[in-house]
């Protein structure tokens, strides 16, 4: 039994039939591969060659050499740089986008499919026929199917960047695009606190949005209202307000999934990024209060975990060490306090894979904290 699915034990006859069937598939695959390699060696860029690459890439989308050959076919047989009509090339590129989309739905984590789609779009850019808004809709739907897909999030940032380039002289529109992305990360995180890519995207968006607002305010000598009522903009009037908002948001994640590193990594970023720490320069005690509040919260979660599981939570202990180290640094005192030592000793017991690291930290032979 694996993931709730009962394994079916094949009879000897069924095994033999399966083996015969697999051998036929392997033979056909090798034959098709040899045919395509021969076509490429002969610099054959025909429609028939393109169809052959279709057949092989449907079977094996990881075969990046075939994607390379496919691009050679498109350029040599259809590209307007080879005296072909722009409309013909545009049509074939859009057909290929459709082919790629079908493959992405079946293999959403295959890098080479995403890579080929980017290439197709840049070819359309050369023709002045790319539709980034449509592409934005495509990647949004793909992320709805798999909201934690790293490739999908990376591709979404790529699309957003190109949408920004199209409106580079309209900073208000650029701001709206990024605020919409910020709100999108909020929705995705609320659905799944383990969505590392959404948290990561948030760390990129927050400084960017804040800087956009600051630039506009400096240029026009006005407050944030110059942007109208853009959803979410009110949070960015003050970094401390934004920090408190996000600390409140991740509190749920800490309580629900203390074993999930995504939430902890985002917490570390919130507590150490210059955007937030610089805002506390004239209010140092407020920063210390926040650190102590977070330490108390994590200690409470750890106590609840001990009641439920009978032992400390690794994520909680590591975070308690991290925040204690921040507090000691702010006070210009040694990091290796008795509480930190106690946490390290517990970690050495419950996290044996990293036991030697914790022991080195206890002995002062490895740093406790990097900042």
From Swiss-Prot:
InterPro entries attached to this UniProt entry: Prenyl_trans_a
Enzyme class: transferase
Protein EC: 2.5.1.60
PFTA repeat copies, ranges: 45-79, 92-126, 131-165, 177-211, 242-276
A Pfam match: PPTA
Catalytic activity: geranylgeranyl diphosphate + L-cysteinyl-[protein] = S-geranylgeranyl-L-cysteinyl-[protein] + diphosphate
Biological processes annotated in GO: protein geranylgeranylation
GO molecular function, one term: small GTPase binding
Gene Ontology CC: one annotated term: Rab-protein geranylgeranyltransferase complex
Keywords: Prenyltransferase, Repeat, Transferase
Database matches in PROSITE patterns: PFTA
Domain of life assignment: Eukaryota
Complex and partners: Heterodimer of an alpha and a beta subunit.
Annotated function: Catalyzes the transfer of a geranyl-geranyl moiety from geranyl-geranyl pyrophosphate to proteins having the C-terminal -XCC or -XCXC, where both cysteines may become modified. Acts on YPT1 and SEC4.
Family, similarity comment: Belongs to the protein prenyltransferase subunit alpha family.
Protein name from the UniProt record: Geranylgeranyl transferase type-2 subunit alpha
Organism the protein comes from: Candida albicans
Lineage: Eukaryota, Fungi, Dikarya, Ascomycota, Saccharomycotina
